Amino acid sequence: MEQSLKGKTALVTGASRGIGRAIAERLAKDGATVALTYNASKSGADEAVAAIEKAGGTAFAIHADFVDPATVPTLFERLDNELTQRNGSNALDILVNNAGNSGWLGFKDATPDSWDTLMAVYARAPFFIVQAALDRLANGGRIINISSAAATKPVTVAPVYSMAKAGINNLTHVLASELGPREITVNAVAPGFTRTDANAAFRENPELVKALEAQTALGRVGEPSEIAAVVAFLASDEGHWVTGQTIEASGGYKL
């Protein structure tokens, strides 16, 4: 199989498990050297790197806690060092903003601190990651933000998360216009309910799963690999004419 991303470098945030790991594995399979970030789960990041290397790919992991605003410059210092050692350059071709934490924070339960924590990871971090990446990102590069169907469809148990993801959609559109002269494409991928470790408790509720499946045109919840496939297309040469779009990959959730 032709490796469409051979010679490219990619940064995928929040890739120790779930959708982020699936994206990292897919981009590596397609030939990219992948830097993946993790926060709480070093073991998960190590497993992701090992799986990529076992499949013949190249990857390395960097710790990053995006609640802390000092993390972004530290991340890029470490990324620069690692890429320069490996490639002789800190050039970056693909950026995937995926990092997250628990988004299940109800309206009545939210406090200023918990609101700030969610917004720091889901909104502030992607903004400043892109800002820091631009000096390294090649002309013709790719920025792919992981949004959510919750940005446009009511999810009453996660209003702060929904707010943040709506902001990501808007940021995507603004950046696409801003970076068009450099032929950098900027898109968002908005998953619906997807089978990951992060929502295992919900998946163990058969009634909830049935309700979600009933609201989905294709009649089931998604798999991380299905989100990764959309990201891989946008990262490839074939995706070069798509920019400023939020692509919902939800199996037709709440059509």
Segments predicted by a language model, with ranges:
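Alpha-helical segment proximal to the catalytic Tyr-Lys
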Residues: 135, 177-181, 240
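Residue(s) in the substrate-gating loop at a strand-loop-helix junction
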Residues: 148
